[in-house]
Amino acid sequence: MPPYLVDDPIVRQELAHYYSTVRRADDAVGEILAALQASGEADNTLVMFLSDHGMPFPFVKTQLYHHSTLTPLIFRWPGIVQENTVDDVHMVSAIDILPTLLDSVGVQIPKGIQGRSLLPLMRGESQDGWDRIFKEYAENSSGERTPMRAIETKRFLYIFNPWSNGKRRMTSATMHMNTYKRMVELAEKDEKIASRLELLTYRVVEELYDVQADPDCLVNLIADPKYQKELTDLRFLMATWMRETQDPALNAFNSRAEPKALAEFMTTQNLGAQRRREWKHAIRDSLRKANTEKVDAPERVEPVPTQP
């Protein structure tokens, strides 16, 4: 059992169901690769497999924790990628996919494109500058705005949660799962689970984890005096990246110790989210109306020609 989940029979059963879906995905990929081989184009095809971010469980899905973004990225390209090799040294991100695909077909990468080509790494080469990644989260599929930013190095993970004020609750599809519901039940009698549930629901403005010693992100080191230098360095890198990417959350980050500034930022964020929801709902309602009118419209009957 992953330590960030509750070890409980109900949770174990749901986790087993997830592992079953992973096996079915593996079966499907096998069928695709077999069809590719049968086509005769396998040696001339770059195959890329990238997982969605995180299992659909609490503390993983719709989060920026270590296991939320530690996903498989697999390449198959005969003659370029050596078989049965694993690169666990370079830290890469999804923004590197587009530059990689452009580079692989000989297209010059346009200026302003974020990310770097992974082609040298795929060839087994070693490069500098792959020692950190930045992460972003904005809102869930329902348009509930809970923006987060994070930077992860090979040793530490720093997370900034501007939405967290001790009252606002985070909503996620994981809350409809049996695992979450079981956590709620167990939290009534277990203080440790209750504490974890509170963190999941309300979070805190800043989090810091030693992902080498604590990859499950169970101990927040944000107030630990032993890690203040590392925290300062990570905050500096975060601010630099946010400036470079023109992140609208930069002012909130610089004012992270001021609840009023964070509240103003979230007011703007929620207003934008509300406008997007209204826009999406208007499109949805328009399509529903059009489909209804199409169904209700009388069917046109063409006249049958008759003999004079």
What are these regions (language model features)?
Residues 1-98, 102-112, 167, 172-206, ...:
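Active-site-proximal cap/lid insertion segments
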Residues 55-59, 124-130:
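Secretory-pathway/luminal and periplasmic proteins that interact with or process carbohydrate-rich
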Residues 146-152, 159, 196-199:
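Short, surface-exposed beta-strand/loop micro-motifs that present aromatic residues
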